[in-house]
Amino acid sequence: EALETAVVENPLKDAYFGETHVHTSFSMDAFIGGARITPDEAYKLAQGADVVVNGQKHNIGRPLDWVAVSDHAEFIGEMYSTQVPGAKGGDNPMLEELRNLKSVDEQRAWFLKYVVENNRGENPGHPPFYAGPETTRSAWKDVQIKAAIDNYRPGKFTTLAGYEWTAAPKAGNMHRNVIFRDLNVPDMPFSALDSADEEKLWAWMAEQEKKGSRLLAIPHNSNGSKGLMFEPLDNAGKPITADYARLRSHFERLIEMMQIKGNSEVHRKFWPADEFAGFENADSVGSFSGREFKKEYFVRWAATKGLDYQAKLGANPYQFGF
């Protein structure tokens, strides 16, 4: 707090540039794909330092002002066992196989079996090489949170503790990055293995608020959600109510519209009069897992639908910042 009070704020405000969706080697999908940058190294890279990964030097060029490393919560315990010397479960032969994946075919097979098929199944769970909740706790506190603390430079570079809740019911992406405003964080993240129901995520977030946490969830990839992101029914199959709208808008004040899986704001097929609607449409995402795009998958549609809810319910579940 003493450090923070020494920071001079501009009363006219400043523009800051950062990132809330960063994956490192502690995300299983990234590790399978060859990522070996740690959370600590990711923060250093964001600040402009040279970082050597897989034998190659990398530099971001222009440093960022703030970053949240948001690795997938679902398998960070497994990745802790995989990478931290002496960690519980690290000698599991399956993890030795994971550490030594070579070909694209081997990587694809691991990704489909332990990430895609598991996460999108009826009952997602930990793989057989999970060594228990203490590894998840260690990955969260000793790696993720520690990296955020160690790289925080008040007034110069802001780190934000966070993680990704990676639910994919019915193969529809319902992913959210959960970001904490300070270090009043839980001992364990709430992952999609605890529940793939976003309403239960919000209930958990409400419990954290009661304990003093300040947090929000940032949805992304609505284009790949199969319509679930902006569905007119709650998870009990009932029409959205004012209470639902208020709860959602309380915790989900922002939405991520652009990332590697494409643009979730708009699509040229549905807004042909918009000359910029063809940017990063990522049609390949629409052809994967039966996710043929519909207008209702996109943020622009949700923004207008939210006005309807405001008129009918007195509350808007889709009043997002972009």
Feature locations, PLM:
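Extended, charged catalytic domains and RNA/DNA-binding interfaces, predominantly
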Residues: 1-322
